[in-house]
């Protein structure tokens, strides 16, 4: 089974998709004139200062936290470990490249989600790639929108949303705390069921409280590991850069890797982690209270920066400096080994708390993504059966094999990204026009303030 899945994975994540994925990011980067570089300070400032005076279901901060809840997950811990184990330290460099260009992609897809969102008779907002494909490209492209929604449900059910997260939670609780898989599975299923029944506002409320806390906890812990291994950090960075462009030889428990394998592992796991181009984040971005589509695009873009440029970088570096990537361990066990090397007394507990929170919030976020895709395909009546099915799959997750889960996740991720990337390229002119209009609005607004002050002074 694993061999068949690996062959499918190699085909899906072959050169064509990698070129389309990174190529879309490069195209948008240049069409937007390096917006992810020059507008990043503005984007970071908007996280807390956005006015939230437009129509929407949740404020911009909660929308970002819900997206981060789904984004910052096991991909940041276990995913980075499996990428480095498969492709060597060079995989981290390709994660950086995917994230850099992915920031322009995330900005564009979330902008389009707000621009083409729809409002029903009850005032409920729906949006995401399926809507900007159908409403932006035209009705004749609806099959492409349906294709995205179908793969979105599969991704929530069998990819990022359930199996990968649940399996990581039960593995780390068993390793760190000795809790049997069955008990963890039951507890997780009950808690997920309780929160998901409440819908977006319930999920967003939990995310707004948990995500900032868990990100700060993980950041401080990993910085602590960097301090413990401070003398090895320069060499680790050199290893990452060298391994990105030259094959990595086999050593210890590491089997060796080609440059192509490092690139494929890094980009695939990078997309799994930050979800840029996947089309998931736009689904919740569409629900944000904002007047300007470009404003929510900027706020959403910071998610990729936080997720990969900060969190994944720290994870990758502590795995390299600690040397555990050369050992026989993989996945959560590999990261747990690095944590306990730095903090023998409490390292495993810190990782346990961080990983459980990361994975749990990812499950909640992806439940919502899948729900919106099901609603697009079959209407509101299909939501309850979808939720029941989701909860059942969460209960099944603990009993599947790690390797098969991650390969399966890669496959459905790639298939989900394909229709979204096609739409992003086709609608890139709309993104550029909306961006220019928003920046012109800000310029005019900033010019009005001194004029008003001068007028008040004269009177």
Can you name each region flagged by the protein language model?
Residues 9-42, 85-123, 144, 306-312, ...:
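Extracellular loop-to-transmembrane helix junctions
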Residues 20-27, 31-44, 166-173, 180-241, ...:
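Membrane-interface loop-to-helix entry segments
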Residues 29, 107-117, 121, 223-239, ...:
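Extracellular/periplasmic helix-exit of transmembrane alpha-helices
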Residues 34-60, 82-84, 88-92, 96, ...:
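Flexible loop linkers connecting adjacent transmembrane helices
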Residues 54-86, 112-136, 147-150, 154, ...:
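Alpha-helical membrane segments and immediately flanking helix-loop junctions
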